């Protein structure tokens, strides 16, 4: 005869996979056109010059250059890419 009572199954024990959100390219980093700069939910950061936005609010570079972060008067954070041609001048 068994002397151990059958253990009940737990209702816990699951978790969703992390979505790997956040900044992928930081201020001052070089990017090429098409590089993902930020993955986000909603528009915590807004696209500035030479930055596009995907349908999932991902910000990506539209030109080769350097990433720049700044906050405007309306208290929104903007991400821009300063083109490489402008930097060289």
Swiss-Prot record:
Alphabetized InterPro entries for the sequence: Ribosomal_bL27, Ribosomal_bL27_CS
GO biological process: translation
Short name of any one Pfam family annotated for the protein: Ribosomal_L27
Keyword DNA-binding: no
Gene Ontology CC terms, in alphabetical order: cytosolic large ribosomal subunit
GO MF terms, alphabetically ordered: structural constituent of ribosome
Keywords noted in UniProt: Ribonucleoprotein, Ribosomal protein
Ribosomal protein is among the record's keywords: yes
Disordered: region residues: 1-20
Family under the similarity heading: Belongs to the bacterial ribosomal protein bL27 family.
Name of the protein this chain belongs to: Large ribosomal subunit protein bL27
